[in-house]
């Protein structure tokens, strides 16, 4: 395999696309056309390495591959960085785009521009990337290339006169696209003679080599005999190995030079030692300052994860630690619940990230888990002028100690067919949304910009959005600020005891409605006991809704045939006393469905 090329013959590019617009299939075509993987080893979605990615048809972990291509008698190196398309994984997108000079903007010829595409394109434009529009799926009978071109120009403001029209599935236009990448996307810039400056834009854990860093060399070069300084930690490490990325196998090399992308092995045991966005430099001749403008991924949603078999707490800890080796955005800390025992409070990027992590824990580690209702971080101002950050409803201080509560807001961008506009605006109003902007992209599509409380979108917003627009709307958001809100803690009491795992922080105006729905749902789910069970929803000490599960009746008078009525009365009174005693000491086992029900109640 050819390995080295002058910097003028290197092209670093990424692929920006909304979920399901054919990005992974296009990546497969480019890999196949450049013969980076033999036909025998080639399979669909070769860049997607997790089973969950293939099953759901999504990209979660950004991958990279080095391609060699000959154009007009010259050898070129094309470094392709595949990126996720879902809003939860936008941190993967931003780090990948920082290491490129260009990006392919892939748009489905049947669907047009979607909200996530716009968000990622703006990240690329902020990083001064050359954008190359690519219209995919042109072979489909309902493809409308002219309308999509106009859509891209109107929505993003990119000239589409030289747009590439391709079909990744039918392999149409792939050769022309490769040539356009070479002629349009600029070569990397950098000083070969300057001290080493390398940006870590991804890291993961390898069972044999330890923590590996995927880097873009901005200045200078790195070789296997160098000692490296990780600028964020101030620690020095020897280089154990350098590799070029390939989805199936790493290709060893003795050096990585300015403009190149490669994998660095420093023999480290955790990805926390090589944080994404950190800078590698030469320990003996370091660069003056690290690469700027990189933010670590912050969790957006928090939920409790508890093992159903309580003796598997340590297994859950081990499993989370193993997943954290590959996922710097995942963080967790132990917590305990009266109802569920010992578990962990886990921070996620969003609901899809939470679903994927829970599914991987259950599938790869054989755990059975209960997840509590997802929540966000609230800023609680106390009467003594101190501030407390609360991510678990059970940690909320008593009402008389709180001066005010601020909740995080997001700016949401939603693109929808205009026929669903009324339904969508009603949903956004129900979710306490504030309209900022409404813009018609063309006669049939509208772009809405709303500010929304984060709390309202972490429950079931995405499902309801798809439901009220028949799946046609696309959605993207970015965090903006914390705003004061009228929030209260809604508790659920079963047989007089507060079930801490079911507590939620909610807008005061919605508390009664939610509490009513919650107790009615739980009445259906909790099995009848030998004693009467009261299910109550409360705010502070005030009960706002109640349902009662009647006791299972045993006919104690069945053996009394006729005779004195006092005999029957005596047996019934004895039963009544027994039930009263049982009610005082009896415990109610809550089924798992009760914890899942809270997620589905609007």
UniProtKB/Swiss-Prot annotation:
It is a peripheral membrane protein. One of its GO terms (biological process) is positive regulation of translation. Its EC number is 3.6.5.n1. Keywords: Cell inner membrane, Cell membrane, GTP-binding, Hydrolase, Membrane, Nucleotide-binding, Protein biosynthesis. One of its GO terms (cellular component) is plasma membrane. It is found in: Cell inner membrane. It holds the Pfam family GTP_EFTU. It catalyses: GTP + H2O = GDP + phosphate + H(+). SUPFAM superfamilies: EF-G C-terminal domain-like, P-loop containing nucleoside triphosphate hydrolases, Translation proteins. GTP binds at residues 20-25, 136-139. GO terms for molecular function: GTP binding; GTPase activity; ribosome binding; translation elongation factor activity. InterPro entries: EF-4, EFG_III/V, EFG_V-like, EFTu-like_2, G_TR_CS, LepA_C_sf, LepA_CTD, LepA_IV. Its main location: membrane. Residues 8-189 form the tr-type G domain. Required for accurate and efficient protein synthesis under certain stress conditions. May act as a fidelity factor of the translation reaction, by catalyzing a one-codon backward translocation of tRNAs on improperly translocated ribosomes. Back-translocation proceeds from a post-translocation (POST) complex to a pre-translocation (PRE) complex, thus giving elongation factor G a second chance to translocate the tRNAs correctly. Binds to ribosomes in a GTP-dependent manner. Belongs to the TRAFAC class translation factor GTPase superfamily. Classic translation factor GTPase family. LepA subfamily. This is Elongation factor 4. The gene is lepA.
């Amino acid at each position: 395999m050819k390995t080295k090329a002058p910097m003028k013959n290197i092209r670093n590019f990424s692929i920006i696309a909304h979920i399901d617009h054919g990005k992974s299939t296009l990546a497969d075509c480019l890999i196949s056309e450049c013969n980076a993987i033999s036909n025998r080893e080639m399979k669909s979605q070769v860049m997607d390495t997790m089973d969950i990615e293939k099953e759901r048809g999504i990209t979660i972990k950004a991958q990279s591959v080095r391609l060699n291509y000959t154009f007009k008698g010259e050898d070129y190196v094309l470094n392709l960085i595949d990126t996720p398309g879902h809003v939860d994984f936008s941190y993967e997108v931003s780090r990948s785009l920082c290491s490129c000079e260009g990006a392919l903007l892939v748009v489905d010829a049947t669907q047009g521009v979607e909200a996530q595409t716009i968000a990622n394109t703006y990240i690329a434009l902020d990083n001064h990337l050359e954008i190359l529009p690519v219209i995919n799926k042109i072979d489909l009978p309902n493809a409308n290339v002219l309308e999509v071109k106009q859509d891209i120009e109107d929505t993003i403001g990119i000239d589409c006169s030289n747009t590439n029209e391709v079909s990744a599935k039918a392999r149409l236009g792939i050769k022309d696209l490769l040539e356009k990448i070479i002629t349009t996307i600029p070569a990397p810039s950098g000083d070969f003679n300057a001290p080493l400056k390398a940006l870590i834009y991804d890291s993961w854990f390898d069972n044999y080599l330890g923590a590996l860093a995927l880097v873009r060399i901005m200045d200078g070069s790195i070789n296997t005999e160098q000692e490296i300084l990780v600028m964020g930690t101030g620690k020095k490490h020897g280089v154990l190995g350098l590799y070029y990325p390939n989805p199936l196998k790493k290709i060893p090399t003795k050096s990585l030079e300015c403009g190149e992308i490669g994998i660095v092995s420093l023999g480290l045991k955790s990805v926390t030692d090589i944080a994404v966005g950190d800078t590698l430099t030469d320990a003996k001749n370091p660069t003056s300052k690290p690469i700027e403008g990189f933010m670590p991924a912050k969790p957006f949603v928090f939920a409790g994860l508890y093992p159903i078999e309580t003796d598997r707490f340590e297994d859950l800890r081990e499993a989370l630690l193993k997943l954290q080796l590959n996922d710097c955005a995942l963080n967790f800390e132990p917590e305990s619940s009266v109802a569920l025992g010992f578990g962990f409070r886990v921070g996620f990027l969003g609901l899809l990230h939470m679903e994927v992590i829970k599914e991987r824990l259950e599938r790869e580690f054989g755990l059975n888990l209960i997840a509590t209702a997802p929540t966000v971080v609230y800023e609680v101002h106390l009467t003594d002028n101190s501030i407390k950050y609360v991510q678990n409803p059970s940690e909320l201080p008593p009402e008389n100690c709180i001066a005010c509560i601020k909740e995080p807001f997001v700016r949401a961008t939603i693109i929808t067919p205009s026929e669903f506009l009324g339904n969508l605006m009603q949903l956004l109003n129900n979710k306490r949304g504030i309209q900022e902007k409404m813009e018609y992209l063309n006669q049939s599509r509208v772009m809405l910009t709303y500010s929304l409380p984060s709390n309202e979108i972490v429950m079931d917003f995405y499902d309801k959005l798809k439901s009220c627009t028949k799946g046609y709307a696309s959605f993207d958001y970015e965090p903006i600020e914390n705003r004061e809100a009228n929030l209260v803690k809604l508790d659920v009491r079963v047989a007089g005891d507060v079930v801490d795992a079911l507590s939620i922080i909610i807008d005061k105006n919605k508390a009664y409605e939610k509490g009513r729905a919650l107790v009615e749902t739980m009445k259906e789910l909790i099995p009848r006991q030998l004693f009467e069970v009261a299910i109550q929803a409360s705010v502070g000490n005030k009960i706002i809704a109640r349902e009662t599960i009647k006791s299972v009746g045993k006919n104690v008078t069945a053996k009394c045939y006729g005779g004195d009525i006092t005999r029957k009365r005596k047996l019934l009174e004895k039963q009544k006393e027994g039930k009263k005693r049982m009610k005082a000491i009896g415990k109610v086992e809550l089924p798992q469905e009760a914890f899942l029900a809270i997620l589905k109640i609007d």
